[in-house]
Amino acid sequence: MLHLSDFSGSDALLSKPTEGCAHASPELPRLPARDAPSAAAYPGGDFLSWALSSCGAGGDLTDSCFLEGPAPTPPSGLSYSGSFFIQAVPEHPHDPEALFNLMSGILGLAPFPGPEAAASRSPLDVPFPAGPDALLPDLYSPDLSSAAFPEAFWEAAPSAGAPSQCLFEPQLSPPDVKPGLRAPPASPALDAAASAFKGPYAPWELLSAGVPGNCGSQGSFQTTPEARFSAVGTKVEDLLSISCPAELPGPAARLYQAGAYDTFSLAPGDLGEGTEGLPALLTPPGGEGGSGGEGGEFLAAPPAQLSPLGLRGAATADFSKPLVADLPGGSGVAAPSSPAASFPAAKARRKGRRGGKCSARCFCPRPHVKAFACPVESCVRSFARSDELNRHLRIHTGHKPFQCRICLRNFSRSDHLTTHVRTHTGEKPFACDVCGRRFARSDEKKRHSKVHLKQKARAEERLKGLGFYSLGLSFAAL
């Protein structure tokens, strides 16, 4: 910096003694005649013109001022002193990036700190001048009285009409730094570099900044907190839209389409045509059992042509072909056949009573209709249960899968085989409640019970004719 003394007052210059002379002469020496006009002209004229003319004439003035011994001196007794220097204190003496940013600020280039530097530095890593006297004010600055301590670098608020600034907004001062300890710039010559250099920025400021080529004026930057955090709300909405999609991704949407597995229908002809699946329906289980009341009922797997709507599905079967059991040389037992359908056959619901009638406690949603019709064209019978249809079909086909192990007699129904075996063993599990007579079949017991009912009715008629009912007596009381 160039510091010049104020030479406007001539009285102040004449009052200072001469510096650097060995002996001061009490009275002014007489100058040569060639310098007389200059000496006579100085008291009311220019001192610099007189000094230069005196030194250029013979050098006596200069020699007399700097050599020891008595010598003539100028009448003013003044010396001109000045200094020209540049006081530059580097912000980071050992940081190449700081030097690069300093030179960029001087040359008018906008610094662009990389992501590594922005991530490694903390918000408190602000550009403070290095050195022991960095925090002291500049004693040689002429504008010390007007502005003692300018604002710190991060608090230099941009104003409209100022030079253009690129990429980032000025960051607010950290809360940990006290306002009284803010460091001034190193020197007034580095104000341009200080305005260009910026400290590390917050992540949302880095995200909200544009590309390096888009530079705008400082007047376009926003300094309000609402404007600073507007980009944060946008980023949060983007993250929520990614983490919580409104619909399934592409592969999942292709695998699970809406309405693909709601309902399925089974065509009547899916189980095969003809009598290929009929032996499997007519084949009884391995053990003995009956469909009547004696030994339980044989409930075969119902045909899979039963649809939810209760439509006929067995009407397409053709029973004109002979079965395996009816062929000559057959053992009477149908050969097992693989199921034609991949879906398991659903079992029909067992009724409390026969004939398709439910009890009073039954809450069946479907109407009580006989959905299982005989597929034979000449037969018009229909049944409410599939096992009843299976027993009926054996009448048309003549299939007798149940054989007695004692006499090798074949039967079309399991209950018939059960009662036949009791004839060989002599078992009579059913006993009359009135007389105690025992029977081998339940239907025989029912027929016998009707005999007792008729006898009771005749006895009551006799007592009524005798007048016992008028006295309040009955046949049971007698």
UniProtKB/Swiss-Prot annotation:
The keyword Transcription applies. Residues 286-296 have a biased composition (Gly residues). Belongs to the EGR C2H2-type zinc-finger protein family. The keyword Zinc-finger applies. One of its GO terms (cellular component) is nucleus. Residues 275-302 are annotated as: Disordered. Its main location: nucleus. This is Early growth response protein 4. One of its GO terms (molecular function) is zinc ion binding. It is found in: Nucleus. It comes from Mus musculus (Mouse). A zinc finger (C2H2-type) spans 372-396, 402-424, 430-452. Keywords: DNA-binding, Metal-binding, Nucleus, Repeat, Transcription, Transcription regulation, Zinc, Zinc-finger. Transcriptional regulator. Recognizes and binds to the DNA sequence 5'-GCGGGGGCG-3' (GSG). Activates the transcription of target genes whose products are required for mitogenesis and differentiation. InterPro entries: Znf_C2H2_sf, Znf_C2H2_type. Coiled coil: none annotated. Pfam families: zf-C2H2.
